[in-house]
A protein has these predicted regions:
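Early extracytoplasmic/lumenal segment of secretory-pathway proteins
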Residues: 42, 47-136
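A bilobed periplasmic-binding-protein/Venus flytrap-type ligand-binding module shared by bacterial periplasmic
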Residues: 187-192, 238-241, 333-348, 364-365
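Periplasmic-binding protein-like
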Residues: 266-273, 281, 305, 316-338
Length: 410
């Protein structure tokens, strides 16, 4: 069939209209995605391929080509580091974008650097962040906004099933994108808590104290501010305060005065029964897991609900090991990706986030050695998800860590 010039103009205009429509849909998806209780993917049922064809996204892809994205992220886990090396190879071959993992011991190092840069061109293009660090960066206007509206695969986020719209009580509002989800759990032999009065698969402060009494010197938790240790303290405080609602808003002086003594009184009972009589603590959950593997500890802690199966499959822990959670629910939060407002390679950073939210990348993260749960609807495994407990407001994190250090850190 021969096309006239009028026909060619028609198809050209049609293509532009399709691109405009895709851009409008992408924006609509992201707006709906941040409304409570609305799943934009289900409402609009828009194929990702249509969002990817928008002129907005095509321009981002063009700008990203040849960029090197400096990704500041925790480097203390071999499975995570291996996963990021795999992702870097995939991103380079698919998008001609180079991903460089800048390993940090704690993301607060990157936050301090952004603060020192004071809004000038940043050496950081992408951050792995959540909690009080996100709260600070958002408050100081140091983050690029509208990420959900400019990254097509954000439409896959399982916002109806997972608590992905707030980060430690702080609304995300497009300033970061969920990458994975963590749920605090305890790994122990299935018989350990069977005679403590706890309901099946759950623990309580009193049942942990009973186990410590029966197994002196073989119970502990990572030293705060290591986040597993801090979260253990938060789980205790939620239980001891009977889920006092003041924990989920800013930590006022009165709330601290009323609630924190509950935690300190409990720890004063637990520590004399703990490893090193509470005079020393594992430096990380990795060290605690190692001591559990060596049978020096009777329990360990994790933020990955899939970790136990990985450990059992590789015969690093006994086959009788069991996953437990606090009776009030497992503290659940997302770990997220954010782009500094002053990033020099923001287009490339958006492409990296887009890939890391893809089914391919999320499946590799879930099924590979990391085993990190997915945050996208197509891969959500509700059967393996623990009953969730809301995270405490971000302000409680610093309060608990500082007060703990004053009382027990010397």
């Amino acid at each position: 069939m021969w096309l006239t010039s009028k026909s060619l103009r028609f198809f050209s205009n049609l293509k532009r209209l399709n691109q405009l429509a895709a851009s409008i849909v992408l924006t609509a998806v992201s707006i709906l995605a941040v409304l409570p209780g609305v799943n934009a993917q289900q409402v609009l049922d828009t194929p990702i391929i249509q969002l990817e064809s928008s002129s907005q996204w095509q321009q981002t892809l063009a700008e990203a080509k040849g960029e090197t994205v400096y990704f500041y992220a925790w480097g203390g886990s071999k499975p995570v580091n291996d996963y990021l090396r795999w992702a870097a190879r995939e991103i380079a071959s698919r998008y001609n974008v180079r991903l460089r993992h800048v390993k940090v011991a704690d993301i607060s190092e990157a936050v301090s650097r952004l603060k020192a840069e004071d809004g000038s061109k940043s050496a950081i293009d992408l951050l792995w962040v959540n909690g009080e660090n996100f709260s600070y960066l958002k408050e100081q206007h140091l983050l690029l906004g509208n990420l959900w509206s400019s990254i097509p695969n954000s439409a896959l986020l399982a916002i109806q099933k997972l608590p992905l719209q707030n980060d430690f009580g702080v609304p995300i509002e497009g300033f970061e994108v969920p990458w994975g989800v963590g749920q605090f759990n305890i790994i122990a032999d299935e018989s350990l808590f069977s005679h403590t009065g706890s309901k099946q698969n759950t623990v309580t402060p009193s049942s942990i104290l009973a186990v410590a009494t029966q197994n002196p010197g073989r119970v502990s938790y990572p030293r705060p501010p290591e986040f597993h240790g801090t979260t253990f303290l938060k789980q205790l405080l939620v239980a001891l305060s009977n889920k006092d609602q003041r924990l989920f808003s800013a930590a006022t002086p009165q709330a601290q005065e009323d609630l924190l003594p509950l935690l300190w009184n409990y720890l004063d009972q637990l520590h004399p029964l703990s490893w090193q009589q509470g005079n020393a603590f594992p430096s990380s959950n990795t060290e605690q897991l190692s001591l559990f593997q060596q049978k020096q500890f009777v329990m360990t802690v994790s933020f990955n609900p899939n970790e136990i199966e990985k450990e059992k499959s590789e015969k690093r822990i006994p086959a009788t090991s069991h996953r437990l959670y606090f009776a009030q629910g497992a503290i659940t939060n997302s770990h997220n990706l954010a782009i500094p407002k002053a990033a020099q390679n923001s287009a490339g950073a958006k492409v990296v986030i887009h890939f890391l939210l893809s089914e391919l990348a999320q499946k590799q993260k879930l099924n590979g050695s990391w085993g990190d749960p997915s945050v996208i609807t197509p891969l959500l495994d509700e059967a393996s998800t623990l009953p969730a407990q809301q995270e405490l407001h971000s302000s409680w994190q610093q309060v608990i860590e500082d007060k703990w250090q004053q009382k027990y850190g010397a």
